[in-house]
Regions:
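ABC ATPase NBD coupling module
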Residues: 40-44, 99-121, 268
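Conserved ABC ATPase signature
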Residues: 173-177, 181-183
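Helix-to-loop junction immediately C-terminal to a conserved catalytic motif
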Residues: 81
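Conserved ABC ATPase "signature" region
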Residues: 30-39, 94-103, 140, 144-147, ...
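A short, proline-enriched helix->beta-strand linker immediately N-terminal to the Walker B motif
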Residues: 192-196
Length: 325
């Protein structure tokens, strides 16, 4: 899991409302009353995207937006780069090294273009690759649009292909690659731009489970090396708990709980969240602190309170001595 740089915010959502329709403002009073999406649509004809969403995301963090289909997670994600309109509230984005907060919904066309080219990159569920181009041409496409030097682009593409294990496929057409390999090309293209913020909208959900697991591992490896800020959309709880340093769970366009995987598993904020976590495997989430009490038996082997339970089980299998926190 990526560890956030403390007190170094890079994306902020402040009471964000997104409504689709010809008269979105007509839905605001009903949002304030806590009405549901179906109630708002029946009364106003407008479709609620997200309601009163507030989040602060730190540089280097992996935050997962999770929920069922239609919960608003992709809608909120696409507000970061101005793809979905914010009717009320504010989204602000900061580029590391630039002491400037920029609102993609209230900035000039030139500033928005700069944000999309240099600050924020995006990976979709559908790979969006150009089939008439080679693998290396697809990886370098964002750099080409940004007008980067050809020699520098070639070197950057070479580095990214090596990172995702596709160096030997650089000259191949993307149509010759499997789905998993094509998504690696999408990852390489996103990371090649060096944009500090990466938006990932269910990028692995259409893949076979084995390939999906492998790409999750590869993403974590890339993140450990490149340390980007990632906002990742998923409807898969195991995926969310594996990737996210924090998880924001959404229901009906609203954020119902945001916390670490351990916090969400141990203290679900609502029956909806409790139902999500009821059948998950807790071994990757819980630590010794959660399952052991502090004792002081002499001669007992001690472990740190944050030792994962999975590691603790292996230690118990390797010793007949007591283990204490």
């Amino acid at each position: 899991m990526a560890k956030a740089v403390k007190n170094n915010l890079i994306v902020k959502f402040e009471n964000v409302d997104i409504v689709f329709g010809d008269k979105p403002a007509s839905a605001l009073s009903m949002i304030d009353e806590g009405k549901t999406r179906s109630e708002i649509q029946e009364a106003t004809g407008q479709i609620l995207g997200v309601a009163n969403c507030s989040l602060e995301i730190e540089e280097g963090e992996v935050l997962v937006l999770m929920g069922l289909s239609g919960s608003g997670k992709s809608t909120l994600l696409r507000a970061v780069n101005g793809l979905n309109p914010v009717i009320r509230g504010k989204v602000e984005v900061r580029c590391p090294g630039i002491e400037e907060w920029r609102n993609p919904h209230d900035c000039s066309t030139a500033d928005l273009r700069e944000m999309r080219l240099d600050w924020v990159s995006m990976v979709f569920q559908q790979f969006g690759l150009l089939p008439w181009r080679t693998v290396e041409e697809n990886v370098g496409f964002g750099l080409e649009l940004a007008g980067r030097d050809k020699a520098q682009t070639k070197e950057k593409v070479r580095e990214q292909l090596k990172l995702v294990g596709l160096s030997d496929w650089s000259g191949k057409q993307v149509s010759e690659l499997s789905g998993g390999m094509q998504q690696r090309v999408g990852l390489a293209r996103a990371f090649a731009t060096e944009a500090p913020i990466l938006l990932m909208d269910e990028p692995f959900s259409a893949l076979d489970p084995l390939i999906r697991t492998r790409l999750q591992d590869e993403l974590l490896d890339l993140q450990r090396e490149l340390k980007r800020t990632i906002i990742f959309v998923s409807h898969d709880l195991d995926e969310a708990f594996k990737l996210g340093g924090r998880i924001a769970i959404m229901e009906g366009g609203r954020i119902v709980q945001c916390g670490t995987p351990r916090e969400i598993f141990s203290n679900p904020a609502s029956p909806y969240v409790a139902e999500f976590v009821a059948n998950m495997n807790p071994l990757g989430v819980l630590t010794a602190r959660d399952v052991m009490g502090p004792v002081g038996g002499e001669g007992a082997q001690t472990v740190a309170a944050e030792t994962p339970v999975d590691d603790l089980i292996h230690q118990l299998g390797d010793t007949v001595a007591e283990i204490a926190v």
